[in-house]
Amino acid sequence: MAGEISDLSANSGGSAKGTENPFEYDYETVRKGGLIFAGLAFVVGLLIILSKRFRCGGGKKHRQVNEDEL
């Protein structure tokens, strides 16, 4: 029993699996996901900017200013 415990503690992370590390990432998948997220954020940002630009140029109401307020 003591030998089994020492064998488990000798492995990285204390797991019985041996060489499999749970903190290794598939960087290609992470990169693709990041690029997709960045592209979507860029497109949404452009849509927000363009929608505000076209809406603000429409019917502007000018307020009349009295000379007393100046």
Curated annotation (Swiss-Prot):
Domain of life: Eukaryota
Disulfide-linked positions: none
Entry keywords, A to Z: Ion transport, Membrane, Potassium, Potassium transport, Sodium, Sodium transport, Sodium/potassium transport, Transmembrane, Transmembrane helix, Transport
One Pfam family recorded for the sequence: ATP1G1_PLM_MAT8
UniProt family annotation: Belongs to the FXYD family.
Role summary: May be involved in forming the receptor site for cardiac glycoside binding or may modulate the transport function of the sodium ATPase.
Name of this chain's protein: Sodium/potassium-transporting ATPase subunit gamma
